[in-house]
Amino acid sequence: MSQLLIIKPSSLGDIVHGLQVATSLKVQKPDLRISWIVRDIFAPMVRACEAIDRTYVFRRHDGPAGFMRLMDQVRETEFDYVFDFQGLLRTGLMTWRAKAKLKAGRSDARECAGLFYNRKVPLPPDGRRSHAMDILLQFCPVLDAKPELQGMVQFRPVEGLNLNYLESRSGASPVVMFPDSRRSEKKWHGFKELTEAIARDGSGRKIVWAGNAYVDYKDAPPESVFLNLTGNTSLVSLPTLIKRACWVICNDSGPLHLAAALGVPTLGIFGPTDPRLFGPYPLTAPNNHVVQAPLGNLKLLTGKDVYARFQKLDGGRSRTAVPFPQRGF
């Protein structure tokens, strides 16, 4: 049995990509045991992934003493391989402190992290213009595995989690939206307009807003049509929530990549970032779709524009528009 340590503390979208690569490695190398160093805020996602055997939690705010305590735990195991998926000084130092025969990192590592590797993984043929997933897949040949995704990432069930209330009275799966983004330039402000258009389209589906940060929606549609779970969406519940959806619509953010990893139809809304590099992977998959704002400016993208695209992707079925009572009037 070979032991692999993956170092990828953040962020959510990058971690999802890494979990997909780990899953592919497990499929191709069933005897491989995979451990992972991850930031505390993302640890529940990594712990829940069936491909990961052990999780080491990095608490950034614990300072140098906390870093050394973490690495003391890591050094209790002698690994065969260490993969630094992040390629920054901090993760380079983690690679240096870990015990392993082979320490591999990205050839485009920054902050002198490359000094701590004894093997540098080449970039794909398109170099830095490659999709983030394709860059991570180049680590697979280090283990004599093919640089391709095999198998679908799986998550352990969450005990006691019941999401049946998300379905409409007809039993239709909901449209799940994630209206928030950590970066303001990636945050589209047309989700209310899009929500109201879908709520009136006659499909009978609920629209669910989700995310860890609360997003206010004044005069929202009634609860029979709309549910706001923003601020009440735990990371560990995210895979189950997304798998219940018939569509996931969101900004360029972690949930978009998780939905793509789980095979759920996705519509990503992109502004300044390039979907060819950061979109749902792969963009050629029949369930993965994006809308790019004109000139990369999300202020120029209307809810009407996105709804027209969604309607076309959703099958263009003719439905009877249904009004819903407005609140606050």
Describe each model-derived feature in a short phrase.
Residues M1-F329:
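Catalytic machinery of carbohydrate-active enzymes
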